C-alpha cells in the first residue's frame, strides 16, 4: 500500500464488506458501498466488483452496491451474478445513476427477466432517467425479501415506510430460487 500514490489508496467504500447469505437454493448478496467501474485514469484494480463477482457466482437477490451511484453494477458483475431481483438503497437525488439503471435493466448484460426495487426514487431522478424509470417495480418504501421455508422460493414485499405501521404497498413473486 505504501507504494501506491495517495490518490490511488483505497477509500472506505473500497473496504466495504461484501456478503452472500445462502438459504437452500436462495443466494442474497449485499456489498455496501463497494466500488465498481473506476473513475477514468484510476487503476483497474479499483473495480472491486470483478473479484467479488468471481467469488460470488449467480445470486437471486442483489442489493446494488454504492446506492446505485455512478460506479456499481459493471457489465462483468451483472453477467456473472445474473440476479432476478435488484434492490437499490437509494437516498439521494443522484441515486440511481441513469447508466446504472440502464445496465440493471439491459438484457445484453444477461438474458432473462429481472425486477428492480428502489427505496427512494425521487421525482427529479425519474425525470432525468425518462421512460426507463417506469420499468421499476417499486419507487419507494421499505423492501422485505421473504424466503419460503427451505429457500426454494421467495417474495418481495414493499412496505410504506412513511409511517410506523408499515402497511403493505405491494407484493411481488413468488420468485423461484435456482
Regions found by a protein language model. Give the residues of each.
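Short acidic, glycine/proline-enriched helix-loop-strand junctions
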Residues: 81, 95-119
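Active-site-proximal loop/helix segments of hydrolase catalytic cores
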Residues: 1-99
Amino acid at each position: 500500500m505504501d507504494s501506491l500514490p495517495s490518490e490511488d489508496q483505497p477509500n472506505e467504500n473500497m473496504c466495504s464488506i461484501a456478503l452472500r447469505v445462502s438459504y437452500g437454493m436462495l443466494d442474497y448478496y449485499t456489498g455496501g458501498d463497494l466500488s465498481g467501474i473506476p473513475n477514468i485514469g484510476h487503476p483497474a484494480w479499483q473495480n472491486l466488483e470483478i473479484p467479488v463477482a468471481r467469488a460470488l457466482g449467480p445470486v437471486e437477490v442483489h442489493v446494488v452496491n454504492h446506492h446505485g451511484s455512478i460506479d456499481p453494477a459493471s457489465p462483468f458483475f451483472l453477467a456473472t451474478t445474473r440476479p432476478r431481483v435488484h434492490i437499490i438503497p437509494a437516498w439521494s437525488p443522484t441515486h440511481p445513476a441513469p447508466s446504472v439503471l440502464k445496465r440493471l435493466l439491459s438484457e445484453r448484460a444477461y438474458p432473462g427477466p429481472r425486477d428492480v426495487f428502489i427505496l427512494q426514487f425521487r421525482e427529479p431522478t425519474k425525470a432525468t432517467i425518462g421512460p426507463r424509470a417506469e420499468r421499476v417495480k417499486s419507487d419507494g418504501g421499505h423492501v422485505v425479501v421473504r424466503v419460503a421455508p427451505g429457500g426454494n422460493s421467495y417474495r418481495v414485499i414493499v412496505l410504506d415506510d412513511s409511517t410506523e405501521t408499515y402497511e403493505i404497498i405491494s407484493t411481488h413473486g413468488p420468485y423461484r430460487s435456482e
